[in-house]
Amino acid sequence: MGETIRFGVSIDEKLLESFDGLIEEKGYMNRSEAIRDLIRAALVELKWEVGDEETVGTVTLVYDHHVRDLSDKLTEQQHAHHDKVISALHVHLDAHNCLEVLVVRGKAREVKKIADELIGVKGVKHGKLVMTTTGEELH
């Protein structure tokens, strides 16, 4: 982490009141930490848009394991990307439905492609990709 720099910001009074409410709701200790998090989030999202940055994400899937060949198809997709799918968690939600959470690491565009392939498998009831940073480039 580099040297800390102080700077001033001009902001509309109502916007500041709303921001202070957000700070309190989220539990930040001060405005500075909230602003740092907003800047980090914007930088991370920008890197995802480019698609060439190393990122990590979770792909969450909900599906009925009784659907013919669905579990096998999902497993095949994971093995097809064995170098990118670094971990998997399987949970039995009830007698029929399973939750699977996969941790995927790679270039942002690769992670998105893998998630789309998995979520698009016929029989998946719900799927979601949540991407985040590896943390290497953040300060």
Curated annotation (Swiss-Prot):
The major lineage groups are: Bacteria, Pseudomonadati, Thermodesulfobacteriota, Desulfuromonadia, Geobacterales
Which residues take part in binding Ni(2+)? H79, H90, H92, C98
- How is the cofactor bound here? Binds 1 nickel ion per subunit.
Alphabetical UniProt keywords: DNA-binding, Metal-binding, Nickel, Transcription, Transcription regulation
* NCBIfam families in the cross-refs: PRK00630.1, PRK01002.1, PRK02967.1, PRK04460.1
Q: What's the cofactor?
A: Ni(2+)
Tell me the disulfide pairings in this chain. Answer: none
The membrane-spanning stretches of this chain are none
Q: Does the keyword Cell membrane apply?
A: no
Q: Which GO terms describe its biological process?
A: regulation of DNA-templated transcription; response to nickel cation
Q: Which organism is it from?
A: Geobacter sulfurreducens (strain ATCC 51573 / DSM 12127 / PCA)
Question: Taxonomically, which superkingdom?
Answer: Bacteria
Query: Into which family does the record put it?
Result: Belongs to the transcriptional regulatory CopG/NikR family.
Record-linked Pfam families: NikR_C (PF08753), RHH_1 (PF01402)
Protein name, per record: Putative nickel-responsive regulator
Q: What does this protein do?
A: Transcriptional regulator.
